Amino acid sequence: MGKRPLRVFLDSNIILSRLLSDKGAPRIILDLLSIGLPFLIGLTGRYNLVEIERNLKKKMPGILSVYKVYFPKLSLKIIPLPPEEELREYFGKIADKDIPVLVSAIRGKADFLVTGDKQHFEKIKAREEYPLRIVTPSEFIDSILPEIFKELKEK
């Protein structure tokens, strides 16, 4: 993994998926981030937090209290909302609602943007114009687990 910790930006759907299920790749990712591995830093955006809370209040208000207890345990670094002028550069490249997610991940110097949103992120995923890899939760697990085991073995 090298000297610098990997920075992993989580889209809202990854955090929501974990709240709704005890299984799957989102669970593994958030569990890894919550144990405080020194070579893995979790990030999300202020925009994502607003989106999560809005969705929970609207669709699953009973889970909001669980989220408020659970979220601080993740120790994610929160990337502030990007300024409007920074967002403009990305109009037309991705769905408007996802621009703040992509820009927040870039501003947070993420190595990975983990999202379950295949519909909107799939078309930009293969482009090399972004300084990060856009991956699904299982793609992230497949790429990172061997590195984690290697890092832990060396300790």
Model-derived regions: residue spans:
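Intrinsically disordered, low-complexity and often Lys/Arg-enriched segments
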Residues: 1-6, 154-155
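Short, hydrophobic/glycine-enriched beta-strand segments
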Residues: 7-16
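PIN/NYN-family metal-dependent endoribonuclease catalytic core
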Residues: 9-10, 22, 26-57
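Alpha-helix capping/helix-boundary segments
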Residues: 14-15, 48, 101, 119-120
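Domain-scale selection of a single, long terminal region
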Residues: 46, 50-85, 101
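Active-site neighborhoods of divalent-metal-dependent phosphate/nucleic-acid chemistry enzymes
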Residues: 77-116
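Acidic, PIN/NYN-like endoribonuclease modules and their adjacent C-terminal/linker elements
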Residues: 119-155
